Amino acid sequence: MVVNPIHANLTNHYTMTNRFKSIFCICMSLAGLMFVSCKSGSEVAGTKVGALDDSVWESSVWISAADAEVVEGKINGSNWRAADGASWFVSEVTNDRKVKSAKWMTAGLGVYDIYVNGKLIGEEVLKPGFTHYEKTKLSFTYDITDVMKTGAGAVNQLSAQVTPGWWGDKIVTPGNHEGMIGKKCAFRGVLELVYSDGTVEYIGTDLENWKAGIAGPVTHSAIFDGEFYDARIQPGYACGETLGKPEVNEEFQGTIFPSEGAEVYMRPDLTLNPVKTYVWEGVYGDSEEYYGTIVVKREVADGQVITLAPGETLVVDFGQNAAAVPSFSFKAAEGTVLTCLPSEILNDGNGAKSRGMDGPEGSCHRLNLRTPVDGMILE
């Protein structure tokens, strides 16, 4: 990671759990961001179950946020970022009678997370996963009875956050394509309520009972782009009054299939600890042909609290590539920006430009990446 701050205190308990991009020789840059998404601190609820009957999809439509940005122009080296913002969808459902059980079948055009009464549903990450963008989307169905208010007349809030990954970003869009393959993120879902008298009601996404809009702390997110997270902003499910009427999305005309066995989960049992952590500032030995070598100011022991001053860069080397997410604790003033930059290798050879190095020896080499940048603005 890289941090070029104002002052920040970080506790060096960096861990990696199998999931995302490569080795994080974490370069943190205090103007930057950490990959968190809206899972911050919330307990995961709901139980993944078999899908509802396909016929119930007829009670729903794909909906999008009317104010969502659309990337225009040919996708190339200077125009490749996904649209900014996360699309949020919120609805309140009133129980006609006492509820015996509740299931929610959902699908997304983009990476999505769902919530019931503000609680994150499902442990899967990067839902719905990679499929042929035009032919297939995967659905996820959960038993949500335990997080529902089941009394007659009780009101429950359903919500979803959808970002462009797998749909409106570079991972599915070829070069020189006019705009992204997917124009706007979308959400679709059907709630099954089984009442205590045995009757069943299906409630789907529609234009009358749902609100939608760009909201929440995730201000940018895509598979290759990384994620920008502003912790000062409330989650979208708490911003219902700022959302507007959704619009029907007819971009996807393929088939929705239940996700069965191809889900991605966090693996805490595969936690990976850093092999070396150091803070550097300044360079020596640089020339026209060489970037030079970093000046290491201090190495950091496991468990040690790190204080970074302006101009300093912290490198956390995990010693290998991994599909993973970095985890660490930090404190800083409100408005501080923390940037976490992943890297697959370190620059070496005194930063020889002839060898394809992009910085001084000992710094993170990022030239071969598609510039993923993760981060968080502290609240």
Model-derived features: positions:
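Bacterial N-terminal signal peptides that target proteins for export
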Residues: 15-25
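Extracellular/oxidizing-compartment recognition motifs
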Residues: 40-379
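Sec-dependent N-terminal signal peptides
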Residues: 26-31
